[in-house]
């Protein structure tokens, strides 16, 4: 749905804004206390988590039974056993998690949207800088070792974004072994209806006593399957209302609304490339660099209407329900968004397990992020003017923490976090809303009529 335009003259000069956020937290945890595990994790369909070690709830390695939070874990074995192909499908196995059938991969946790949840991938915050959303398709599901979900506010440990909880995703990384050189290949080829592909190939290799490397490539795509169904409420017919009579009664849903059709086939093409190298420095001390590249294109095509007149589907007009009621159709409701995303994520992590010290520095660079939408479409195959909203952004994050766990009955965690975020949104007029490069310069140079920026 198109936002209201704020037409203005642009000078092209770039604004800058810089500030810094620092978070310091110290937690005292009574290790000998008897903790009651939250009831909503005792669900029969949930993966077994008894005696599982978690690090997300308290930022320390702790038995999940002793954790004072509602925590659930999904492992790579759960993903393989249940043939899960997306991160959202993996999380949907857990209680309190709902996957939206409308949004592309949208999640709700205890009623909160994913924009209220902090998502970490190997320590890299994956929430975007524009609206705090998460692009789940950017995460290579077949490289995942485990997913930890902590429900409830976690601001004291992770900052203000963890209102609904924290999702911590760890990918598989082989650890160096003594005088062992080996290589492990993994992969899969999947094909399904609607031109669906799910392919993955990768390896982990021990190249020396101190160094291991790994790389994985993944592609998931589909030509589309019906999604985002459209409904409407009936209104009273007035003397001035012009209506058409459908060939058949309009389908009605249980809530009394009428099923008008759908946006059509929800297609996407997602490609991921990930790599890492780990160097063993000393005993129980290591340095790891990891990289993730992802590119995704998504769109709705071939919209469908449940209403026909004289055998032809219609997408606009007032459709007569009976002598007193009608339902209005608007072509714009049948056309979805056309989106494009491209990210680079870099992560450098130092771990000293002996002294329980961890330092992480990462960058999430969203080179491309945005979508286009049509302006006043009059046919379902409309390829005329539209709007493009493009909002790339960057997150730079530094995190360090130290744990002291031999202090009587208590454990002390001290840490510091520094984060810098920025984004720049550009809105342009397009001659063809499906073509992100078809800038309409009739009114504004390059079609650019609005710029919004933000930084923290």
How should these model regions be labeled?
Residues 191-222, 231-301, 340-353, 406:
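Transmembrane beta-barrel wall of Gram-negative outer-membrane proteins
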Residues 1-82, 89-94, 279-283, 310, ...:
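N-terminal Sec signal peptide and the immediately downstream disordered periplasmic leader
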Residues 131, 184-189, 198, 258-263, ...:
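Extracellular loop and loop/strand-boundary signature of outer-membrane beta-barrel proteins
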Residues 56, 88-125, 145:
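Extracytoplasmic beta-strand/coil segments of soluble accessory domains associated
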Residues 222, 264-270, 284-349, 363-394:
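Flexible loop and strand-edge segments within Gram-negative outer membrane beta-barrel domains
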Residues 87-90, 105-108, 135-140, 149, ...:
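N-terminal periplasmic accessory domains that precede
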Residues 337-341, 383-456:
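Outer-membrane beta-barrel transmembrane domain signature of Gram-negative proteins
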Residues 125-153:
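Short acidic/polar hinge/loop motifs at secondary-structure boundaries
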